[in-house]
């Protein structure tokens, strides 16, 4: 496979790697980025090596070119990470204040008698154990979700040792894996492992805000907010007037990565009488209702966000929400339609799998993520289906502020897939409208009880972590039967976790008749739909036309759903298929998702090439 690089990978500043504030929904003034060079080693035994193999650039996986390692972690191996950090004399700043070296209150000070220190991992694939100064802090399983540990008692003044051990079974286990495969090819791609999102430290008061959840209710002109903490405390919430976060601001001091702090990449929250809606008081762990008059609704053209700050004891965080509502409603012809703020919205989407040739699961920079999302809108898409992957929170923040609707897939897992069944046979069954119950765990690769329980746990946590993002309109539970089980039960669980959003319970085939969508995949046949009385008709995958460009393709072999010999041929087929989609709108079609945004390895059916340097579809 030929190694390709994006322009962001080619110009990567290795002293400032993905240093933007990683949690835009809840911004705190204390932030120490631990991205950068770490020691690494591969071992056969679960024993920390005395000597390491070299340096790895975190948060890029060892399989990614930007990591500097270029080596696959195998299921019978362990990957070890090591670095040091200091909690003395580090400068910090509030997310909405200017930087000041003279501030005596700033810094990751070693005196933590009245403060706590939290260690955050954006994602580590697949299972890991963490030590600080030789003390085991905790472990985590699941390669797609963030987690954190309190490390206060393990930290000492001066230099501290941080060690992470990783095990990744990839597609040889039932754990969530997405499109990763040790033997890549076709629609499955290079397996990656280890730390793949930002690692960071956060200093918090002893009594601190653990979580802020918002529930906007635009029809009632109010928002409900709950501030969660370990006990009951008084809280103060200052709500700002809505605005659109068009311009990003980055105020980072000229310090090396290990000494720097960052702020949320957005306009700072200002508290003046001209910009403030009001100040509201309540208690932690109780819902507080706040009236919002003259509501500015979030839309794709006007993505208004409401900034706010929360104060509790000595703690203070900043966040945002949006006033918007996704519903199913019937139009004048009786067709069920997807509506945004009670207005019919045809969701013209594109499938995005979040792979990069130089970073694999990790975008080379924040600017690279922004490029993809801005170009999607310029290409006429108002929706993106995030396929079998969970992105860093900043990706969803950019969708929020740019006005790009998101369908979020749950990440698939399970045993070894029977592709003859879930691909070829299922395609024909879908065309002939043969409905199969999801009770055949062997055919659908869900025999392990542990795997089923883990899927439910991760589905709930995915919703919990992401439901604050207004851009997310729909959850997709299962894709093409991969690891599918108890679909109606999963739909009920998900509906209870988040009644605010729409649900695609089975994208492609093995539809059990529930959820909000009749969700079809069609790559080979004439496009047609069969509108239903209660569910919206969506074409959740189609297209996939392949066109390989020499010098911008990673593989000589190509994969797709119709080979085109040139750009003109590709665009002719694309326009013809899109015209067929357009004609179905009057027959009840509510949304469509073109496959796909960019080429990935052998699968050269992207709007863009894998390196994002050439747009193939005009």
Tell me the role of every PLM-derived stretch.
Residues 113-116, 218-226:
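Short coil/turn motif common to extracellular beta-sandwich-like domains
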Residues 65-86, 115-121, 126-132, 138, ...:
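Active-site-adjacent substrate/metal-binding segments within catalytic domains
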Residues 1-31:
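N-terminal pre-domain segments of enzymes
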Residues 121, 223-230, 342:
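Aromatic/hydrophobic beta-strand junction motif of beta-rich domains
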Residues 2, 9, 39-43, 71, ...:
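Accessory beta-strand-rich segments of carbohydrate-active enzymes
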Residues 153-159, 228-255, 265-331:
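Extended acidic/polar, glycine-enriched regions
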Residues 383-616:
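Substrate-binding/catalytic cleft of secreted carbohydrate-active enzymes
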Residues 35-58:
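Predominantly extracellular/luminal regions of secreted and cell-surface proteins
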